[in-house]
Amino acid sequence: MAITSTAQSPPVLDTNGQPLRRGVEYYISPAITDVGGNLTLKSRSNAPCPLFVGQEPVTSTNIGLPVTFRPTEAGKDIIDEGTSLNIVFEALSTCATSTQWRVDATESDTGRRFVGIGDEDGPAGIFGISRDNGAYNIVWCPAMMGRPRCGRAGILVENGVRLVALDGDAFPFEFIKA
């Protein structure tokens, strides 16, 4: 009889040292505090609807929007590094039916993929969290896709607006319980 063992990934910790939990609200904040604020919804090109994940300016008095993490594995309550999960802003939007994060198509002018919001039950809405050099990165690399072109979330400044996008330098984040 074969015995298999699977190593348990360490839990992702919030700024209080507690494991992230399914359904609990958190702010996603930069681990480098002098470059920008918490994550929120932003619009591109002065569009009337904020349909993209972005970052508050460092000088803003807005605290951003809280998110919840929803592991794709039924019954999983603790968020471990590498857990496949959905990320959802806990805010109402009159512009979108869902505030769940998803990866958009590659932009031809930047070669980057922006993170937007909207209905997404497929792989475009599945993220994970990894730890690198003591900070956390938000990653997109759904296992069900046979390892597509994976990416780490970073910040791309477009017309003065800080937007979350893949395919550039990773941006370190931390999680603050709301």
Predicted region positions:
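Extracellular glycan/ECM-engagement signal in secreted proteins
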Residues: 2-47, 82-89, 93-178
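Structured domain cores in non-transmembrane regions
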Residues: 46-98
